[in-house]
């Protein structure tokens, strides 16, 4: 009877550890995704600004 109890406790402990690891990975993935979105938006803004400056320079002399 003691062995069954011990095995059950070990399974519960393993399950908790797996859940903890999964939650940690999900948090990390969300953080990475947020960082990628921010970088992408900053790059988009920079591209638009450069394009605007190039067009302004080209047509300002006309």
UniProtKB/Swiss-Prot annotation:
UniProt-annotated stretches for the region Required for DVL/RTFL small polypeptide activity: 27-58
Biological processes per GO annotation: negative regulation of cell population proliferation; shoot system development
Membrane topology value: Single-pass membrane protein
Bilayer-spanning residue ranges: 39-56
Predominant location category: membrane
Segment forming the signal sequence: none
Keyword S-adenosyl-L-methionine assigned: no
Alphabetized UniProt keyword annotations: Cell membrane, Developmental protein, Membrane, Transmembrane, Transmembrane helix
GO cellular component labels: plasma membrane
Cited InterPro entries: DVL, DVL_RTFL_regulatory
UniProt keyword Transmembrane helix, yes or no: yes
Location(s), subcellular: Cell membrane
Similarity-based family: Belongs to the DVL/RTFL small polypeptides family.
Function: Small polypeptide acting as a regulatory molecule which coordinates cellular responses required for differentiation, growth and development, probably by restricting polar cell proliferation in lateral organs and coordinating socket cell recruitment and differentiation at trichome sites.
The protein, known as: Small polypeptide DEVIL 17
Species: Arabidopsis thaliana
């Amino acid at each position: 009877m003691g062995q069954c109890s011990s095995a059950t406790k070990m399974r519960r402990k393993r399950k908790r550890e797996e859940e903890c690891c999964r939650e940690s990975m999900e948090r990390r993935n969300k953080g990475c995704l947020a960082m990628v979105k921010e970088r992408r938006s900053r790059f988009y803004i920079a591209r638009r600004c450069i394009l605007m400056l190039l067009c302004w320079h080209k047509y300002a002399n006309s």
